[in-house]
Curated annotation (Swiss-Prot):
The active site is at H646, D663, C713. The gene is SENP5. Keywords: Cell cycle, Cell division, Hydrolase, Nucleus, Protease, Thiol protease, Ubl conjugation pathway. This is Sentrin-specific protease 5. InterPro entries: Papain-like_cys_pep_sf, Peptidase_C48_C, SENP3_5_cons_dom.
Amino acid sequence: MKKQRKILWRKGIHLAFSEKWNTGFGGFKKFYFHQHLCILKAKLGRPITRNRQLRHFQGGKKALQIQKTWVKDEPPCAKTKFSVDTPHASTLSSPVKRKDTKHFVSSSRTLLRLQAEKLLSSAKNSDHEYCREKNLLKTVTDFPSNSALGQANGHRPRTDPQASDFPMKFNGESQSPGESGAIVITLSNHKRKGFCYGCCRGPEHHRNGGPLIPKQFQLNRHRRIKLSPLMMYEKLSMIRFRYRILRSQHFRTKSKVCKLRKAQRSWVQKVTGDHQETLRENGEGGSGSPFPSPEPKDPSCRQQPYFPDMDSNAVVKGTNSHVPDGHTKGSPFLGKELSLDEAFPDQQNGSATHAWDQSSCASPKWECTELIHDIPLPEHHSNTMFVSETEKEIATLGQENRTSSLSDDGVKLSVSGADTSVSSVDGPVSQKAVHSENSYQMEEDGSLKQNILSSELLDHPYCKSPLEAPLVCSGLKLENQVGGGKDSQKASPVDDEQLSVCLSGFLDEVMKKYGSLVPLSEKEVLGRLKDVFNEDFSNRKPFINREITNYRARHQKCNFRIFYNKHMLDMDDLATLDGQNWLNDQVINMYGELIMDAVPDKVHFFNSFFHRQLVTKGYNGVKRWTKKVDLFKKSLLLIPIHLEVHWSLITVTLSNRIISFYDSQGIHFKFCVENIRKYLLTEAREKNRPEFLQGWQTAVTKCIPQQKNDSDCGVFVLQYCKCLALEQPFQFSQEDMPRVRKRIYKELCECRLMD
């Protein structure tokens, strides 16, 4: 352990001396404290005889100061070399020699110091040069200790700066009085990582004629920084924090994804880029070679395509050249991927004619194949065949007697009965031909960049992605693909006035029968109008809805009541069935009466106040409620339970003596079931039915439809009762509640159950 500490101690000393870790930051304020202590004691003139390590620092103090003042090699512009006397070198290096220190000053650095001194001594012949250099040296030495020059590179300020403490280099060392120049002072760090902090301007130009340019501040960012554990640097935590972020898996994954996205080009960029490369290859391949010549890297050296003006047809060998049948298989153009060359026009008398491959069909015909040698090429004629290829698919477009005229403004392609703009698979092409001295030159950077993404070209199928491209190869028409389309519907012979009168009469009938438009559905309105006019009015729903809204505004209040047996419902009771309202006791009780009357011999429906009366007053409070009814002759008893804000249902199956609990929220109130069981036992003793005094069981039904809101519990209870009474399965859910509400409204108004 002691040996390990000693090794770390020495590493810390070496790191503090070398200052590698200080590159790129400001002056370090806190570094190895022993070194700081030694230098401070040395400046104060106090002897340091603490221990062996401190003596080592005392001996290396001067070496550290000299090491901080190392300079770069002489710049290339320095022409003069000086000879050095050995006595001076020995005198300079003698103060540095100590017992426990190393020689940090080499002969080359001593030579540089002597060169600066000899430069000053040789300049005394010229008063102008001497004064200028003396003033410059004075300016450098008089810099304050906290200036940018003294603080640069992390050097600590010195107490007594002298001219000898600043290693300097001078560009333009020996000049005659008549010559002019500029002096560059270079203050360099150790290991020849020099930095030029300024240029002391003399005249405008150097004596050799070249302009004087100050050196730029350069920092090797790829240089690794090895940190010692004994180092106390105030920015170390920030370095570690940023390093952890950069090395995190999320950051690296995100950066990789961003690089991949940047590297991938969009489909339009690929199209335009491939076409620009094609234009360059076509322009350079005019020498008759089947393969395009390599493109120069310098864009200024690119040759523009040249079109010869000849009375005869100009045939250029390429992918679109005319090859007789039988020679296609031996074509040198077969490969994995071929580039599309623009069809060269046949030029006659200063005009060019673009024509397509003539075929028997009048409409454009697309033939898709996988290999190029499977496409039959027509014989050579005056027209030019247009061949387009994308990887393994080759399409041949033929059009009969279609020409395009080439003028000074551009190339216009007109095709009747087809798209007005025609482009190749590799991308849209916009050309501008300029006629000058029997030649046509194509401007690549001008019109191509301006019109390459025009609206007309982007509308073309080949400017869209492959997923959005129409199915042209299969010959399918895109017109009226979905159901013939509603756009082709004929104008309705029924005007708005007739429709409004018929609709108003139908709404009057609904209001008279139900007291409101709550049970009315859209399907019923459209069905009624179709029966009257024998026409579908689905396309006129906005007008119908507007008429219904106006009708409701005119008939807001209606004196409507329903009487059934001992029950009476007014509009306030029926309004609970509208929207998300809670059902009240009147609606529950009257609907239970309808269920009981639908199957009078099997089902008995208790009033919603029965359970509350039983809990508050006991059996004597409800004894008279079943005075005229023998409960034990029924098959099913339906008992609604209303607990403040929630509706539940208890059923009693007398055949097997089972008491069941139904709740649309999955709640089980055991005390309610126990109260009903005690009531049945008491009722059996009162009616002298000993067979029902024992064998009762309770059950909780869970696999039933559940509500998904807080307002439809009463509707679920009524639907449970109806399905159990009519022995129907539970085939409803929360989505059916609006329809169930309308149906219950109608059943209450018509005083009968509907299937």
